[in-house]
């Protein structure tokens, strides 16, 4: 256990490299993807594919290669004898809520298995019900070798976790840990979250609200002349025709008597991540407020 997504993502890389040293003759390089976001530690900034991060705090840790998202040929070309793992988000949140193509994911799982390369799933943003399943990998009918969780698993408190299949568990006592990781208070919260969210009834409700939200966003795209709506479960985005996302976010925050929290990871994109407990009426209210914010944002430009 850890406290943040970056912490457990870095632990996943450590574990993969430990396995590579023991089982793959010292293989250590990790392939990640253009547009990826894995955290703000130096190593995870190297693993991320966010523009400019390779020089912001240079020199950066080495041992990370990049491939193109949803391009299996790019991954295949990036694999070398030194490759120990591929690290992927099933939905790239910071890059603009870009979901992985199911066919690509299945090909990636087959390729990594064939080449004896570990598949690390960064489910910090997508896990614990966010995409309508306990874990987003369930949408693809595959399983990763290592998986990281944070954000949702803590229900608002700092809790994160690294999970792995037993054959890849090469950590020895003292290899990984932290002062507050897995402390009793946070663990109790995490257990309550998992026992509540990871039930068939709760997840079915998430999928119903996700379908409702997606339909509403598609109507907004048509009515407001936007570019597209996309996402998975209750992690969704609106693509705008111009770089007006910041203005829309500000307009949404200032709506009265109730504001609307939006996020703009890209100048032309709005990200929506409502609470998993959102009900039908709240979805409709949010969609109505979003329409108002879009009009106000357009007027501001």
Residue ranges of predicted features:
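Conserved N-terminal phosphate-binding loop of PLP-dependent enzymes in the Aspartate aminotransferase
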Residues: 1-301
């Amino acid at each position: 256990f850890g406290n943040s997504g970056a912490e457990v993502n870095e632990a996943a890389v450590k574990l993969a490299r430990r396995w590579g040293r023991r089982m793959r003759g010292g293989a250590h390089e990790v392939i990640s993807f253009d547009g990826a976001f894995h955290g703000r530690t130096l190593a995870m900034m190297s693993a991320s594919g966010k523009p400019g991060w390779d020089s912001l705090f240079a020199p950066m840790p080495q041992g990370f290669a990049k491939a193109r998202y949803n391009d299996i040929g790019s991954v295949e070309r990036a694999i070398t004898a030194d490759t120990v793992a591929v690290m992927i988000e099933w939905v790239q949140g910071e890059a603009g809520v870009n979901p992985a193509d199911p066919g690509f994911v299945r090909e990636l799982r087959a390729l990594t298995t064939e080449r004896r390369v570990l598949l690390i799933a960064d489910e910090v943003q997508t896990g614990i019900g966010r995409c309508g399943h306990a874990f987003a990998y369930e949408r693809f009918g595959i399983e990763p070798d290592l998986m990281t969780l944070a954000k949702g698993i803590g229900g608002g408190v700092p809790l994160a976790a690294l999970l792995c299949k037993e054959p890849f568990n090469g950590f020895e006592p003292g290899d990984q840990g932290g002062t507050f990781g897995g402390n009793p208070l946070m663990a109790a919260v995490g257990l309550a979250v998992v026992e509540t969210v990871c039930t068939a009834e709760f997840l079915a409700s998430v999928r119903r609200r996700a379908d409702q939200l997606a339909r509403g966003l598609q109507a907004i795209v048509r009515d407001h002349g936007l570019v597209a709506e996309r996402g998975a479960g209750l992690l969704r985005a609106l693509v705008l025709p111009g770089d007006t996302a910041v203005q829309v976010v500000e307009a949404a925050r200032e709506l009265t008597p109730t504001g609307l929290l939006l996020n703009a990871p890209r100048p032309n994109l709005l990200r929506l991540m409502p609470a998993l407990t959102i009900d039908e009426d709240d979805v409709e209210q949010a969609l109505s407020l979003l329409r108002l914010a879009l009009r106000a944002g357009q007027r501001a430009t």
